[in-house]
């Protein structure tokens, strides 16, 4: 028999269910509200010195919800296919079709895990509301299964257009049969004529840059003009003029997207690949898969004109990493407070082509010990992350090595510094931007916020020298509001005057991101609570206004 309390409980539950159903499904006669804006934030989810323990894909799956809750909207994952060995970071590409599924190069798994774990990681990221970008390495192949005799000529390393020997035969590592995979997924076998050159003659144990001879053999063009022609980078260089190569790479692209359900690409070393290749390849893969496939290319040059040229030659089909901006951060961090902060965006993609700029502070190539080592000093990193995460220009990318640390070099995690800036981007960095880039040390900017994102708006200051203050405009809609420093670097507050201005402060060599203190309802109106030992409803909880945080 039902007790009185249980009858009351069931009655309220029925009423609550009825009201929720009415709210969710009954037409209101009003058009649906547009979704509130949400800033995109990418994370490069690896660094060079990760241990060879096959656990990264599992970590992605385990961390997906946490990362998404902080505002990360996309993960750039490392190359997922088999490299020259199990410990290969992924850029010594052996077999594009082996995602940790076949016993090749001494193991089934890659450095990061198995194919099944990779697919589970992607599914977990999607379930958490994040996209996944795959790292694509088409410049070269390494770890060949055998050698072939090839006619070749030596070229000058500083000017690859200059031949410095006669033609002679070399023994080149260019034979790729994939014995562990066989013909699964693809029966294509790579031979010497699918490549332009190598840097090793096995017969003489000689390291040179060799350009192959034969019908149609020459360095690809157009590529970057560094060293005369920068087609050749390492290993066996793919010949993007060979129709069989182009067809096979297009087939792989379609297979990869359909197999993994990834959402986009990070393209490695695009300055070394024929400029006309990727627009054609992307058009084909996007068409074949029916997915827009966001794409960012790595064109490593601090010369902004080279980046502009590439964007023009590729018709804006992809974004580019803003290497010039990274160089600005690096230089500022090493200048002991003498860098002119007014020039932080000068000659960068962030300024010149913001919609195609992927901004970053550091990456796996700029880490200590790497070929492009240019590690931004730790004191400056919070300033740099504030710059890319709270401004309107560019698509920012957070680096795994900054977020989690790099044990190999005893580099500590900056998670406690980066998290508040991620929250600033997630909740506050919206609306019209006003710049105050008018001082050699202290620069600032504000965002007015948008009505679709209640409580949004901010004021940011960074300085590479002494601390100080700036009067900055955040909008009259914020008049009377109290702003506090989300980073916790300052404990004071700022009250916005009737004209929408406030005097915001920053400590020396530091950053402050000022946001409006929120007033919000802390609980759902008329929520129902129960004692843990009974199923009776015992009280109503009134809504209450609290200052937050």
From Swiss-Prot:
Active site feature: 268 (nucleophile), 298 (proton donor)
Cofactors, names only: Ca(2+); Na(+)
Record InterPro entries: A-amylase_thermo, Alpha-amylase_C_pro, Glyco_hydro_13_cat_dom, Glyco_hydro_b, Glycoside_hydrolase_SF
Record site feature (Transition state stabilizer), residues: 365
Residues involved in Ca(2+) 1 binding: 139, 231, 237, 272
Chain positions recorded as Ca(2+) 3 binding sites: 337, 339, 440-441, 464
Listed GO biological process terms: carbohydrate metabolic process
Group of enzyme by EC: hydrolase
EC number, as in UniProt: 3.2.1.1
Main localization, broad class: secreted
Keywords, ordered alphabetically: Calcium, Carbohydrate metabolism, Glycosidase, Hydrolase, Metal-binding, Secreted, Signal
Family: Belongs to the glycosyl hydrolase 13 family.
Protein name: Alpha-amylase
Gene this chain is encoded by: amyS
